[in-house]
UniProtKB/Swiss-Prot annotation:
Record region (3-dehydroquinate synthase): 1-352
Reactions catalysed according to its record: 7-phospho-2-dehydro-3-deoxy-D-arabino-heptonate = 3-dehydroquinate + phosphate
Gene this chain is encoded by: aroB
Protein name per Swiss-Prot or TrEMBL: Bifunctional 3-dehydroquinate synthase/phosphatase
Cofactor: how bound: Binds 1 divalent metal cation per subunit. Can use either Co(2+) or Zn(2+).
A GO term for molecular function: metal ion binding
Pathway: Metabolic intermediate biosynthesis; chorismate biosynthesis; chorismate from D-erythrose 4-phosphate and phosphoenolpyruvate: step 2/7
Subcellular location: Cytoplasm
């Protein structure tokens, strides 16, 4: 362990050091979020000596909970347990927890001591040091706050071993910012020379870069503790970043991701004013690229984005203030004009938002993504927003051959909601792709439905063929793999009314077919009678035989070698149930393996509990069709003799983003 300042320690496996600083307090509150609590509360209970005076409080995880509503219950808890001015708060978590814990300590009984134990890289190099503590106002980030220095800061780089990759990269964005804030470029060169060791979480290198970042930040904090002058330079990249976070409701981009883009914005402005050259800008871009951090700005409407930049706390007299630098490392705080902002953002017209909507038999889904256009090729860069609603558009369509009015109304309500979200993000009409699948194409009144949706939402629906659906599914899945991936894959999508199969590889599609077997269709055919569900063994056997008979059309596929990849709700739900997910985690699901045995286990669980109790990981709105869908899934594996499949989150929504759905 290294003492880098009187109150700041950096090292590995140094949590026990806390015992040296807790003896003089009558009560201790370990304040964290639910994710960190699950990982580390037990370790703290075994590490801290005076266990009878230690209390624990965990809030929900996320920037959206960094508000007064989340803090009031903490005050209540502290009052109920007789916390006094001689009590201590230990903030255990990332930037949100460090900010909130500091704010609580600054305001409870007009101030008590607190210790920061930052668990994310972002918090270790930023939020835990400097004494700025704050919570968010609904209209602006960090608007309600104070200045209060922690009693101690204990930085243990071992925490970074359990940090998700995205969060580590977010911290690197803020850490790299510090390398631009010093004229001495040795720190920047050290980072460039140790990229692989940093990525591999080498303790010695991590300790060095965290220490150096803290020294740079502490320099500015010490000469300007209340941010009246040079400390503002620490806000390099933050004017753009805070506006970007606000535009997307603090959900699409982590703080470090936004700051990385914001640094490039400030450097673009520095270039525009002739303070740096293109080579300097490109070197900066490349440094971020070494850590797979995207720094391209997004082409957003200036009439919505510029007002958000005006709300930054550096501003006054209605001026937008940001930080510039020159090639020698001199920093300056300056006003940026609206025409300069427009000129910079216009350089990124090929980096924009695109939306795709899938109107299925059972559900409607929306994906909004950041994409890049190069000539006519679209590259997916980032998921911005994703949603699913069970609308049951295809209710009884297999029997009646038309879409019921109440089903249309349910779907229309969902599409009106999606229209509002799309409009909020100012997505151009040409970048809204909406397609309908099996239920719509099987109905006799599809033209009425399509016209009604357009009249009331201005969303243009393309009713696509099974072949087209298979094509965009494949394109969505294959985007997950590197270009040098050579294996054949067979992608299947169990929808509500049909299941699409597409065989191919990175070079293209070889075969595709759409079969009229789907989770809604099988349920209505074998398990639903007069609105009552009957999953008897006899009905299940009939359903399995029906699926097997339909799968015979895949005889040509059976002779080939391929990896089997499943997409869409029936398949992804199997993983969320296996993992007992209370909150759906698409990153954990994407490209995970799912075995035949696990599918069998899930099917038994569904049959046993479908009408009795909630099943963790199963959306209650999907339970009506999950047994039928799981039977189809299991029969597909059995037909091809596969012990497992790969589960992909990328499907026709992604394919539509990349390829569109118009016939070419």
């Amino acid at each position: 362990m290294k003492k880098i300042f009187d109150d700041i320690y950096v090292g590995s496996n140094i949590i026990s050091k806390l015992n040296d600083y807790t003896e003089d307090f009558d009560k201790i509150l370990i304040f964290s979020n639910e994710t960190i609590a699950d990982l580390y509360f037990e370790k703290f209970k075994s590490t801290l000596n005076e266990k009878d005076k230690v209390f624990y409080f965990a809030i929900k995880d996320g920037e959206e909970y960094k508000n007064i509503e989340s803090i009031l219950p903490v005050y209540d808890f502290m009052l109920e347990n007789n916390f006094s001015r001689k009590s201590l708060i230990i903030s255990l978590g990332g930037g949100v927890i460090c900010d909130m814990g500091g704010y609580i300590s600054a305001t409870y009984m007009r101030g008590i001591e607190f210790i920061q134990v930052p668990t994310s890289l972002l918090a270790q190099v930023d939020a835990s040091v400097g004494g700025k503590v704050a919570i968010n106002h609904p209209k602006c980030k960090n608007m309600i706050g104070s200045f209060k220095n922690p009693y101690r800061v204990i930085i243990d780089v071992e925490f970074l071993k359990t940090l998700p990759k995205r969060e580590f990269k977010s911290g690197m964005g803020e850490l790299l910012k510090h390398s631009f804030l010093t004229k001495d470029k040795s720190y920047l060169e050290y980072i460039e020379n140790n990229v692989e060791k940093i990525k591999n979480l080498d303790n010695e290198v991590l300790e060095n870069i965290v220490e150096q970042s803290i020294r740079i930040k502490k320099h500015y904090v010490d000469i300007d503790p209340f941010e009246k002058g040079e400390r503002a330079f620490l806000n390099l990249g933050h004017t753009y970043a805070h506006a970007l976070e606000s535009f997307f409701d603090y959900k699409a981009y982590t703080h470090g991701e936004a700051v990385s883009k914001g640094i490039i914005f400030d450097l673009e402005l520095s270039l525009l004013r002739g303070q740096i050259d293109k080579e300097y800008l490109e070197r900066a871009r490349n440094i971020f690229k070494l850590f797979d951090i995207d720094t391209d700005l997004i082409y957003l409407p200036s009439d919505k984005f510029i007002p958000l930049m005006r709300k930054d706390k550096k501003n006054s007299f209605n001026k937008i203030i940001t930080i510039l630098l020159d090639s020698e490392g001199h920093l300056s705080k300056t006003e940026v004009k609206e025409d300069e902002i427009v000129k910079i953002i216009d350089k990124y017209k090929n980096n924009f938002l695109r939306a795709s909507i899938d109107i299925g038999t059972n559900s409607c889904r929306l994906l909004i993504a950041e994409v890049e256009k190069d000539n006519e090729n679209i590259t997916f860069k980032k998921e911005i927003y994703k949603d699913l609603e069970i609308v049951k558009l295809g209710e009884d369509v297999n029997k009646n051959k038309f879409l019921k009015e109440e089903a249309i109304e349910r779907t229309l309500k969902c599409l009106k909601k999606y229209r509002k979200i799309i409009d909020k993000y100012s997505i151009e009409e040409k970048n809204i792709i909406c397609f309908a699948t099996s239920a719509t194409r099987d109905s006799t009144n599809k033209d009425y439905f399509i016209k009604k949706v357009f009249d009331e939402t201005k969303i243009k629906i393309n009713c696509i063929s099974g072949d087209k659906e298979a094509y965009i599914n494949f394109k969505g899945v294959i985007s997950s793999f590197d270009r040098d991936f050579k294996d054949n894959i067979l992608v299947f999508d169990i929808g509500g009314g049909s299941t699409e199969f597409t065989l191919g590889n990175m070079q293209g599609i070889e075969k595709k077919i759409s079969l009229n077997i789907g989770s809604v269709r099988i349920t209505e055919k074998f398990f639903l009678n007069n609105k009552l569900y009957n999953y008897s063994e006899e009905n299940r056997i009939k359903a399995k035989d029906w699926v097997k008979e339909n799968l015979k059309e895949l005889e040509d596929f059976k002779k080939l070698n391929f990896s089997l990849i499943g997409v869409a709700g029936t398949t992804t739900t199997q993983v969320s149930v296996r993992e007992k997910m209370e909150v759906y985690d698409s990153e954990k699901i994407h490209l995970s393996n799912l075995t035949s045995k696990e599918i069998n286990d899930n099917l038994s669980l569904f049959i046993k509990n479908i009408n009795k109790q909630e099943i963790k990981g199963l959306d209650p709105k999907r339970k009506d069709v999950i047994i039928g869908g799981t039977i189809i899934l299991k029969e597909i594996l059995d037909y091809f003799g596969k012990d497992f499949i790969i589960v992909s989150e990328n499907d026709n929504l992604m394919g539509a983003i990349l390829e569109g759905v118009e016939n070419k």
